[in-house]
Amino acid sequence: MFFALAALGLVAMASCEKEAEKTPEAAPELTNETQITGIPFTGGEFTYEFDSNKKWTVAGDAEVTIEGQTYEFGLTPTSGDAGHGVVTVTVPANKGAEEISYSFTLTLLGEDKDTKPLTKTVSLTIPAPSVTDAAGNTYKVVYLKDGNYWMAENLRYVPEGLTPSKDLKNVTAGVYYPIKVSDDHTKAIQTSDENDIKAYGYLYQAETAFGLAINSLKTEEEAKRVEGTQGICPKGWHIPTSKDIINLVGKSVSPFTLNDKAPYYDGKNASIKLLNEDSFNIASWGAISIQDNSKTEATLMGWMKNNPDIISSGYIHGSTFAQKYEFPQGGTQTGIKNIQFLGIMPMAGNGTANGAKLSYKIGASVRCMMDKATKE
């Protein structure tokens, strides 16, 4: 009996010594970690990569709500073994006015209960919507209730080879300086002040807005082909079509049909108030009025004596053909007298922004809309 107990004691001691001699588990280690940067406001799928000596998990909120807008994020896969880890992060498009910050947690797990896990917070930022033109000018962008991204500022890009003009006898300048009320409130004037240009943008004739040379549109067929063109908009954006315009504001002139379900139609008209409540920042900025190809001098449109403190009307270009006029046969001029496209006409007096026809010779504002394929 004595010898048996002694033997058991020796076995127990040996077991304890082995336990004491056991090599501690290596601490969790994270190396070769990449960062998620350069996310566009349109979101997308991005990879977070790392090397780990342990099994790992990732976790983060599937939904984040900001100012009433819910954003859905995705993490795939949510766990993995030691080695090279790759997590695909699905990032939503930013539909608000401010940047969005989001983070998720990576945890490296030890096999031994006494091994402390390694936890790492991974952060990313979705920038506020904006777009930059070919000259480096950056514009605010807004996501509107029609389900599209629109520029919330007027274009102020000068195409190569053109110079903004103040000469009202130059009816083929292509680009004109913006308009404002004179200091004595007695008329509309053009302004080359940099702050005014930033606030109001330049005024463009339609062919320039479409990226074409002045007087290059000669037929109805050519005019119809420019619908939805990028023109002088940034890549991935376009001059709005009649569908874009009517789905936004609802009301338009004949032959275009009313859309009474449009989000900014108030039951009677397109509402500047409703549009600006959603930060579209639309106003009446005036226009360079050139009625048709028979005119040799322009006038400044938008100022009225009965409302002298503001510019009362203006135009925003659209790219859908609306109507054409030809010179009468037998006259001194032949061919196209005028081509009209459907645009938007903001009117400060009654607060409307309905679809309207405008001559392709008029110098008007440009607001670009993001292409659907790019947005999605």
Where are these regions (language model features)?
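Conserved positions within compact, well-structured domain cores
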Residues: 23-26, 125-376
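A short beta-strand micro-motif common to beta-rich folds, especially ectodomain repeats
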Residues: 87-91, 98-112
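Short, solvent-exposed loop/linker segments at the N-terminal edge
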Residues: 37-43
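Surface-exposed binding patches on compact interaction domains or structured appendages
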Residues: 29-32, 45, 51-88
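Beta-strand-enriched, solvent-exposed domains that form extended recognition/catalytic surfaces
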Residues: 22, 27, 31, 71, ...
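Bacterial Sec-dependent N-terminal signal peptides
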Residues: 3-37, 110-132, 316, 368, ...
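Intrinsic-disorder/low-complexity, polar/charged segments enriched in Ser/Thr/Lys/Arg/Asp/Glu/Gln
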Residues: 43-47, 84-88, 101, 117-121
